[in-house]
Amino acid sequence: MSYVPIVIEQTSRGERAYDIYSRLLKERIIFVCSTVEDHMANLVVAQLLFLEAENPKKDIYMYINSPGGVVTAGLAIYDTMQYIKPKVATLCIGQACSMGSLLLCGGEKGMRYSLPHSRIMIHQPSGGYRGQATDIEIHAQETLKIKRLLNELYSKHTGQELKHIEKSMERDNFMSPEEAKKFGIIDNIISSRDAMTMSAK
């Protein structure tokens, strides 16, 4: 288990200790910095809902450094981002691959960012199934449905034609921030917090 730093906050009432992620949550910053799976997705969804309840008019900032993961877990986060009232700004730090790239481009239009040396990757969903032939066929059909759904979502958020999305996602498609901006996954490449603040205005 990795160590999570504890930070001390000085207030008029004394000192209070937070783990680093809880302290940043107070600043409306959410981290998606691991493989996307059900447990972490539930935590991210809960944080999004909490921040909406706290202030439905104030922006949320989602920092993404993820290799991707389970499609349904990623869609739970994506749907919640679209569902809540606050605008969700997304920022790629390191990598946003597979479902991580969908979350990146699913942020508020004009508020989707990447740091200069991040990597973004899109591809079609994969599945490995074992069992009876009928069950394998059922799962294969479901994978194709998910593939079509993801293609439609990428098309919606990037502005690319569906046929171009389908072709681009046929294999692992790695992009630099410049390429991701041209593709429509992000809106701006930033190297400082000031640049992020200025581009959001």
UniProtKB/Swiss-Prot annotation:
Compartments reported by the entry: Cytoplasm
Keyword annotations: Cytoplasm, Hydrolase, Protease, Serine protease
This protein's name: ATP-dependent Clp protease proteolytic subunit
Listed EC numbers: 3.4.21.92
Family membership noted in the UniProt record: Belongs to the peptidase S14 family.
Protease recorded as keyword: yes
CC per GO annotation: cytoplasm; endopeptidase Clp complex
Chain's role: Cleaves peptides in various proteins in a process that requires ATP hydrolysis. Has a chymotrypsin-like activity. Plays a major role in the degradation of misfolded proteins.
Biological processes, Gene Ontology terms: protein quality control for misfolded or incompletely synthesized proteins
InterPro entries, A to Z: ClpP, ClpP/crotonase-like_dom_sf, ClpP/TepA, ClpP_His_AS, ClpP_Ser_AS
Keyword Cytoplasm set for record: yes
Catalyses which reaction(s): Hydrolysis of proteins to small peptides in the presence of ATP and magnesium. alpha-casein is the usual test substrate. In the absence of ATP, only oligopeptides shorter than five residues are hydrolyzed (such as succinyl-Leu-Tyr-|-NHMec, and Leu-Tyr-Leu-|-Tyr-Trp, in which cleavage of the -Tyr-|-Leu- and -Tyr-|-Trp bonds also occurs)
Domain of life: Bacteria
